[in-house]
A protein has these predicted regions:
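Long, compositionally biased stretches
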Residues: 198-218
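Non-catalytic alpha/beta scaffold blocks inside enzyme catalytic domains
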Residues: 1-203
């Protein structure tokens, strides 16, 4: 829950703490730059050298030096009409801290793309639904809580070229006039390895207030 890590850190800063995530893909997502203040590989977005490294890898002239929006920020912006579109993949609105607000955000957003394996609340409200294959139908890599890589075991090899999230994002990028160069899992994995290990600074621990849960529905 939000605030747990801050509470542990406040109790005793000398204690070594390890985070074992609930979902298999969370460590890899953070390493890929999921958090609004991070670039891939744990590079901080306001670090000039980090931005130069990533801009060079992506073939970009420059990158913004301000953090992006987290999930709550994106949903709030969508509710306020400040986002033109949302691309939502594998998110259950009922799992969000504010399910009602999340539903309002999706319903109020001008254009919603749902990338899904199965029917969901988001796909029911989406303008475009792009189905993707199951986990066991495509290759890939997970990082465990110790950052050790583990390959995904492909069980169903029937589709020769499964429509996975990589292909969907590459296609969307192409339609928007940008060439990602990441049309396959192998290309994405190579791009990740080519970035190398970040040798610069890392973000400092900031305090996060605890989440006050909503009253249960009766």
């Amino acid at each position: 829950r939000p605030g747990t890590l801050s509470a542990i850190n406040d109790l005793d800063s000398t204690v070594r703490v390890a985070w074992v995530p609930r979902r298999a893909g969370e460590i890899g997502a953070i390493e890929a730059g999921l958090l609004p203040q991070l670039l891939p590989g744990g590079r901080f977005v306001d670090d000039a050298k980090a931005r130069i490294d990533i801009a060079a890898a992506w073939g970009a002239t420059n990158l913004p030096n301000q953090p992006g929006l987290d999930a709550d920020g994106m949903l709030a912006a969508a509710r306020a009409g400040q986002l033109d579109a949302l691309v939502v993949s594998g998110v259950e609105l009922a799992d969000m801290p504010d399910p009602t607000g999340a539903r309002e955000a999706v319903e109020n957003c001008g254009f919603v793309v749902s990338v899904e394996q199965r029917f969901s609340e988001v796909s029911a409200r989406a303008d475009v639904v792009l189905p993707v294959c199951l986990l066991e139908e495509t290759s890939g890599t997970f990082l465990d809580w110790e950052h050790r890589p583990g390959r995904v075991r492909v069980v169903n090899k029937q589709p020769a070229t499964p429509m996975n999230e990589i292909r969907v994002l590459d296609a969307l990028s192409a339609q928007m006039g940008s060439v990602s160069g990441l049309a396959t899992v192998a290309q994405a994995h190579k791009a990740w390895k080519d970035l190398g290990q970040w040798q610069g600074g890392h973000p400092k621990m900031e305090s996060t207030p605890p989440l006050v849960p909503q009253a249960p529905m009766v």
